[in-house]
Regions:
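Nucleic-acid substrate recognition interfaces
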Residues: 1-139
Length: 139
């Protein structure tokens, strides 16, 4: 059974810039979700434990797509939509694991200390003559 396949990429300068932007968007989405959850929880405690205790992954994605992307955060459009979606999903999963007692409290990702990475959905990749075609990235 084939579980993973490792490939070596030789990106052009433009593609390398897009990879770095994708890693930055993923980190930003992860940190944004954690920050929003902390803010909502603080409001919940300050209001005498009345209202929402946390915010859902779907609500944050809708807020980013409908409010932030068209106005102040237009740079989010430069990378594939799955990159931002996966960053939010990873943060949501980290919080769920924390609340179940399976892991420690999730920390904000640092631009300089953490290894830049992002997830690419394998379904969005297709093999082409001499390379691969991905969401907003082609070889």
């Amino acid at each position: 059974m084939l579980i993973t396949k490792k490939i070596r990429l030789k990106p052009t300068t433009e593609q390398e810039i897009l990879f770095r932007k994708s890693a930055g968007v993923s980190r930003w989405a992860y940190n944004f979700f954690l920050g929003e959850n902390e803010r909502i929880y603080r409001e919940y405690i300050d209001n005498g434990k009345v209202g929402k205790k946390s915010i859902s992954e779907g609500d944050v994605r809708k807020y980013i797509n409908n409010i932030l992307k068209p106005t102040t955060h237009s740079w989010l459009k430069e990378v594939g939509s799955n990159v931002m979606k996966q960053g939010v999903k990873d943060a949501s999963l980290a919080l769920q694991r924390y609340f179940k007692g399976l892991s420690g409290k999730p920390k904000f990702k640092s631009k300089h200390k953490d290894r830049p990475s992002f997830y690419v959905n394998y379904e969005s990749l297709s093999r082409k003559q001499g390379g691969f075609q991905g969401e907003k990235i082609g070889f």
